[in-house]
Amino acid sequence: MKVTVQRIPFLKSLEIAASIVASRPQNEVLRYVKFDADSKTLQATDNELSIVCNVADAVQYVASPGKALLLPAKVIPILKDCGGESVDIEVDSQLRITTQSGGFTLSMPNPDEFPSVKIDASENKAGVPGVALADAIRQTIYATDTESTRYQLGGVLFEIGDRLTCVATDGRRLAVSKCQLAGEVPAVSGIIPVRPLQAVSRIIAAEGCGVSMVIDNKSAVFVCGDISLQTRLVEGRFPDWRKVLPSTDQSATLKCDAEKFLSV
């Protein structure tokens, strides 16, 4: 494999893909991000959470196709510090990176050892503005319970209907946030783990675009621009949170001093 890429766009995508790499993976090969010159994608996974970044716009020239495994801890500093607009990435028995400031040779596992990462979000996509989704995540994720054995409370419940409803609780606190959806999709729900939602928030901040979501019985997919992220759902049944809320049509408005209220 021998490919020339634009340094800054490729680096940006590599940093996003590397953000989901587990610090202590069960399989050593999962410490790497796979660069597939055939599909022009970067792929990373921990077998629970997977990401695919389309880097076609960053690939300038493919002299010979193939695959490379990039160790983020080593490749990212090289791309940050080397300067120049373009970088050559080549694989023979080793990974070779040629930059404006010099060449680097790194060892890497066989790319064929990396698990296949395929993300399909072609059907029943629900669209939501990126800012609205990021706000909904921020307003609920703090109320999750990630430390107890009640695994169903370790994520945020996503209910898709005429709008998106996000719910989280740790048994003491209950947080609910709602936002509008674009288009009509079948009603569906699933519990999304905390770590994937943190990754989605980072992607929205980096890409600044809308998000398409697909939830099925076992997984959820989020697509933002050139980035697709797939996660397994949390198993278990989420509590009937609507029974916790007061069932009354009466409403009241309470005004208070924000500074004093927050100091209580």
Where are the model-predicted features located?
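Structural preference for solvent-exposed beta-strand-turn elements
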Residues: 1-264
